[in-house]
UniProtKB/Swiss-Prot annotation:
InterPro entries: MECDP_synthase, MECDP_synthase_CS, MECDP_synthase_sf. GO terms for biological process: isopentenyl diphosphate biosynthetic process, methylerythritol 4-phosphate pathway; terpenoid biosynthetic process. Belongs to the IspF family. PANTHER family: 2-C-METHYL-D-ERYTHRITOL 2,4-CYCLODIPHOSPHATE SYNTHASE, CHLOROPLASTIC. It comes from the Bacteria. It catalyses: 4-CDP-2-C-methyl-D-erythritol 2-phosphate = 2-C-methyl-D-erythritol 2,4-cyclic diphosphate + CMP. The gene is ispF. Pathway: Isoprenoid biosynthesis; isopentenyl diphosphate biosynthesis via DXP pathway; isopentenyl diphosphate from 1-deoxy-D-xylulose 5-phosphate: step 4/6. Its EC number is 4.6.1.12. This is 2-C-methyl-D-erythritol 2,4-cyclodiphosphate synthase. It comes from Geotalea uraniireducens (strain Rf4). Involved in the biosynthesis of isopentenyl diphosphate (IPP) and dimethylallyl diphosphate (DMAPP), two major building blocks of isoprenoid compounds. Catalyzes the conversion of 4-diphosphocytidyl-2-C-methyl-D-erythritol 2-phosphate (CDP-ME2P) to 2-C-methyl-D-erythritol 2,4-cyclodiphosphate (ME-CPP) with a corresponding release of cytidine 5-monophosphate (CMP). Binds 1 divalent metal cation per subunit. Its cofactor is a divalent metal cation. 4-CDP-2-C-methyl-D-erythritol 2-phosphate binds at residues 8-10, 34-35, 56-58, 61-65, 132-135, 139, 142.
């Protein structure tokens, strides 16, 4: 059994899509990043990489590499999970929190869970995603960015 923790944050900007958990969410701004900037999937990837002792997503998918420009974070997550499977691990459970003042994310969470479960080859009941605000405090509360925290438990297959 291995435990990993992941955290990521991206700035909200004009003229970008807002993609969280592989879901294109209607909003006037999106997250800035080299890839699709899916902060939730990046935090999940980091948690899994941490659990298997393989560094972080910056090591595996550097933002200096043009190959990852605009990359689909679902595909990056699938690659990370393949590393975990290669070491003999499967998802025990995953718990993630998205921190965003706006937009309201609750209607999109079921699809996020499905996307994540599919990418991780895990049952959806092992995946939990929730969203919270910061009551207008800090960068997330001011609408400057979105953060995500993840804890993952990996079990030997």
């Amino acid at each position: 059994m291995r435990i990993g923790h992941g955290y990521d944050v991206h700035k909200l900007v004009e003229n970008r899509k807002l993609i969280l958990g592989g879901v294109d969410i209607p909003y006037e701004r999106g997250l800035l990043g080299h890839s699709d900037a899916d902060v939730l999937l990046h935090a999940i990837s980091d948690a899994i990489l941490g659990a298997i002792g393989e560094g972080d997503i910056g090591k595996h998918f550097p933002d200096t590499d043009p190959a990852y420009k605009g990359a689909d974070s679902i595909k990056l997550l699938m690659h990370v999970m393949a590393l975990a499977v290669g070491k003999g691990y499967a998802i025990g459970n995953l718990d993630a929190t998205i921190v965003a003042q706006r937009p309201k994310l609750a209607p999109h969470i079921p699809q996020m869970r499905e996307n994540i479960a599919r990418a991780l080859k895990a049952d959806a009941d092992r995946i939990n995603v929730k969203a919270t605000t910061t009551e207008e405090l800090g960068f997330a509360g001011r609408g400057e960015g979105i953060a995500a925290y993840t804890v993952v438990l990996l079990e030997r297959k």
